[in-house]
């Protein structure tokens, strides 16, 4: 049976583990910059200049990492 891959979780977990800065674009056009400290099905906790913000995913339009995210290692673990 083939595993279902949740690419959103893989992406957020990689930027969290590798401490990659991200820019979150909200649906209202506002931008938030910082580092992912945690996430669940509905929210992302972002650390920005020492302050934590909880962002609801339904308000997110786009997440842009400051450097490339390597999916290959994470996807290999899931597929093994």
From Swiss-Prot:
Coiled coil: none
InterPro entries registered for this protein in UniProt: Hfq, LSM_dom_sf, Sm
Cross-referenced CDD domains: Hfq
Sm domain boundaries: 9-69
Keywords associated with the record: RNA-binding, Stress response
Listed GO CC annotations: cytosol
One Gene Ontology biological process: regulation of DNA-templated transcription
GO molecular function, one term: RNA binding
One Pfam family from the record: Hfq
Subunit note: Homohexamer.
UniProt function note: RNA chaperone that binds small regulatory RNA (sRNAs) and mRNAs to facilitate mRNA translational regulation in response to envelope stress, environmental stress and changes in metabolite concentrations. Also binds with high specificity to tRNAs.
Family: Belongs to the Hfq family.
Protein name: RNA-binding protein Hfq
Source organism (scientific name): Alkaliphilus oremlandii (strain OhILAs) (Clostridium oremlandii (strain OhILAs))
